[in-house]
UniProtKB/Swiss-Prot annotation:
Gene3D superfamilies: 1.10.520.10, Peroxidase, domain 2. The gene is katG. Binds 1 heme b (iron(II)-protoporphyrin IX) group per dimer. The keyword Ion transport does not apply. The keyword Metal-binding applies. The lineage of its organism: Bacteria, Pseudomonadati, Pseudomonadota, Alphaproteobacteria, Hyphomicrobiales. It catalyses: H2O2 + AH2 = A + 2 H2O; 2 H2O2 = O2 + 2 H2O. This is Catalase-peroxidase.
Length: 723
């Protein structure tokens, strides 16, 4: 407002819309089940509409022209944000690193697969200072190619091209990442209320990195991985090394990859801390409209070039920071280092003595030499015995270092894309990599009817068939596109021994289904799903509905050699509300664990509801438990679960931890037993609304058809070949 503006008055209309302030429903009732994570990324938020197909749009992309434009960008310094040494390679590598580096293997969330760096909280993390400038530099290219290139793909490609321009022979690149259009609500980044709060709150014992809270992979709120100044900002390279090992492992990286990514990430570019962070404007989410989505603008000085402030650490790591070489290891091992501070006050390491020719030149004036630096994470590579051995090997063999880094960079930027079948473009590497969870192509030429006939004659119960198929498919994670029924890894270690898969029952069922696969030429993966489908069809028929469950042949069977057993450990279910099972008591409630699994499976709240009701009456509970089986006709796909839950003839009485009885209000007699997961379908107002739909007399067939549709969605969740 200008100086003549009147004082703000009360608006007679705006109180009707909660656009800025006021408590949300979840703030008023913080213990209520928050179903928002199932409703995010709705088609209503996507401006491209439901008919847009990104994979089809990619077919029209001129990839070579795009790469040429990106190469030109790397040396096209802009006055509003000048390039260090006339090159943006370091900046673009950082933008990509900080997008991909948020991935964690525990739940598959984070990473570069969605373009989430454009939105809160990542766009405003302290560790992402000035990535907003990098994305703004990319905007003219995004504008030019439009819908043919997603932001997610462009951000991932930018860093890859940066390394190419710097001189690295990169391993390859795949397109296929689709953009989201709003912040992710499902990702838990920690419960701290302030940026860079001490690490102690997310560790059982901060001196024991393995006690970092799951599923987190970063040591502090707002960081990508470790604090470059040391644990809680206190320099101790050995302690930092221990945190690095755990953090990178939670990103899916081993020690060699950790060293390669750390050193390779610091071979080009520099850190910026030549000034005071107090002079910076708020982050993008907090900045005023005049900043137009940018943040961290220096309000009291140039704030660009040599005066830029980002992490607060100041300096380059190598003598030639725009060139891919072995300069990082040469610098690290050639000198002795002493702890010092940057102009911004950040802890960093400086060489005790250094020859003038080994110093990097100033980013603006090549006649000026500057002092290089190392972070605590860099020094960790020198002092940790394992990291040191790897580092020295890299130092003495640049070709080996370059190859390991190129592969690790490819893994970093593609780990959350899922299997190779999702890769698009001319630069997809031919080599199959174990972390891609390779699956051989399956047959589609066998007689499906003959397989079903053998399943029907197998003597296996409907509950056995349905439970085994569900257990095989439920491992799918929409976050990083891992898991699922394709590959039939449920028959391999470690899945065959997971408690949640009921190993004894699973072994018995597989001993019947595997011979059927061999006899018919079908994959065991297909037979498992087809058996589940047959079970659902029989349950529907028992309820009076003759409905065929859709089936698409073509799943393959992965081998033990194609399966990294250790990497599948994070996919083990610790609870499955759909089968009414929890491994043990957790701080998180069973219904919250159910919600998390439903979100990873890509289910909506109505689909969650219909699957719970159907699986209960079919009798698919873990161990054959009776909890939630609100029917006198188990094995039939009836609406009995919902009619019982909504019947006021019953009361619900707690009988133990996570256990309840449903009792007749008049006689007090116990009718059924239930868990919290069962009762939340009737207690949560949103889920109850869906339950009432299925309890209606006119929706019995609708329930059966909706259940089959949701079931098929889960069975086909990993069938990217059908897209």
């Amino acid at each position: 407002m200008d100086a003549t503006s009147k004082p703000a008055g009360k608006c007679p209309v705006m109180h009707g819309g909660n656009t800025v302030s006021g408590k949300s429903v979840t703030e008023w009732w913080p213990n209520a089940l928050n179903l928002d994570i199932l409703h995010q990324h709705d088609t209503k938020t996507n401006p491209l509409g439901t008919s847009f197909n990104y994979r089809e749009a990619l077919k029209t992309l001129d990839v070579e022209a795009l790469k040429a434009d990106l190469r030109a960008l790397m040396t096209d310094s802009q006055e509003w944000w000048p390039a260090d040494w006339g090159s943006y390679v370091g900046m673009m590598a950082r933008v990509t690193w900080h997008a991909a580096g948020s991935y964690r293997v525990t739940d598959g969330r984070g990473g570069a697969n969605t373009g989430n760096q454009r939105f809160a909280p990542l766009n405003s993390w302290p560790d992402n200072v000035n990535t907003d400038k990098g994305r703004r530099l990319l905007w003219p290219i995004k504008k030019k190619y439009g819908n043919k290139i997603s932001w997610a793909d462009l951000i991932a490609l930018a860093g890859t091209i940066a390394y190419d321009v710097a001189g690295l022979k990169t391993f390859g690149f795949a397109f296929g990442r689709e953009d989201i259009w709003a912040p992710e609500k499902d990702t838990y980044w920690g419960d701290e209320k302030e940026w860079l709060a001490p690490s102690d709150g997310r560790y059982g014992d901060v001196s024991k990195p393995e006690t970092l809270e799951n599923p987190l992979a970063a040591v502090q709120m707002g960081l990508i991985y470790v604090n470059p100044e040391g644990v809680n900002g206190k320099s101790d390279p050995l302690a930092t090394a221990a945190q690095m090992r755990e953090t990178f492992a939670r990103m899916g990286m081993d020690d060699e990859e950790t060293v390669a990514l750390t050193a390779g990430g610091h071979t080009i570019g520099k850190s910026h801390g030549n000034g005071s962070a107090a002079n910076l404007s708020p982050d993008p989410e907090a900045a005023g409209p005049e900043y137009q989505g940018l943040g961290w603008i220096n309000t009291k000085g140039r704030g660009i070039g040599r005066d830029t402030v980002v992490s607060g650490i100041e300096g380059a790591w190598t003598s030639e920071p725009t060139k891919w070489d072995n300069g990082f290891f040469d610098m690290l091992f050639k000198h002795e280092w002493t702890l010092t501070h940057s102009p911004a006050g950040a802890s960093q390491w400086a060489p005790i003595t250094i020859a003038e020719e080994d110093k990097p030149v100033d980013v603006e004036d090549a006649s000026i030499r500057t002092i290089p630096m190392m972070t605590d994470a860099d020094m960790a590579l020198k002092v940790d015995p394992i990291y040191r051995e790897i580092s020295l090997k890299f130092k003495d063999d640049q070709d080996h270092f370059s190859d390991v880094f190129a592969r690790a960079w490819f893994k970093l930027t593609h780990r959350d894309m899922g299997p190779k079948s999702r890769y698009v473009g001319p630069d997809v590497p031919a080599e199959d990599l174990i972390w891609q969870d390779p699956i051989p192509a399956g047959s589609t030429s066998y007689d499906v009817a003959a397989v079903k006939a053998k399943i029907a004659a197998s003597g296996l119960s409907v509950a056995d068939l349905v439970s085994t198929a569900w257990d095989s498919a439920r491992t799918f994670r929409g976050s990083d596109k891992r898991g699922g029924a394709n590959g039939a890894r449920i028959r391999l270690a470690p899945q065959k021994d997971w408690e949640g898969n009921e190993p004894a029952r699973l072994s018995r069922v597989l001993s019947v289904l595997e011979p059927i696969a061999r006899e018919t030429g079908a994959s065991i993966a297909d037979v498992i799903v087809l058996a589940g489908n047959y079970g659902v069809e029989q349950a529907a028929k028992a309820a009076g509905f003759d409905i065929a469950v859709p089936f698409a042949a073509g799943r393959g069977d992965a081998s033990a050699e194609q399966t990294d057993a250790d990497s599948f450990a994070p996919l083990e279910p610790l609870a499955d509300g759909f089968r009414n099972w929890v491994k043990k008591d957790y701080v998180v409630s069973p219904e919250e664990l159910l919600l998390d699994r439903a979100q990873l499976l890509g289910l909506t709240a109505p689909e969650l509801t219909v699957l719970i009701g159907g699986l209960r009456v079919i009798g698919a509970n873990y161990g054959g438990a009776a909890h939630g089986v609100f029917t006198d006709k188990p094995g039939a796909l009836t609406t009995d679960f919902f009619t019982t839950l909504t019947d006021m003839a019953y009361s619900w009485v707690p009988t133990g931890n996570n256990l309840y009885e449903i009792r007749d209000r008049k006689t007090g007699a116990a009718r059924y037993s239930a868990t919290r997961v069962d009762l939340v379908i009737g207690s949560n107002s949103i889920l109850r609304a869906y339950a009432e739909v299925y309890a209606q007399d006119d929706n019995r067939e609708k329930f059966a058809r909706d259940f089959i549709a949701a079931w098929t969605k889960v069975m086909n969740a990993d069938r990217f070949d059908l897209i």
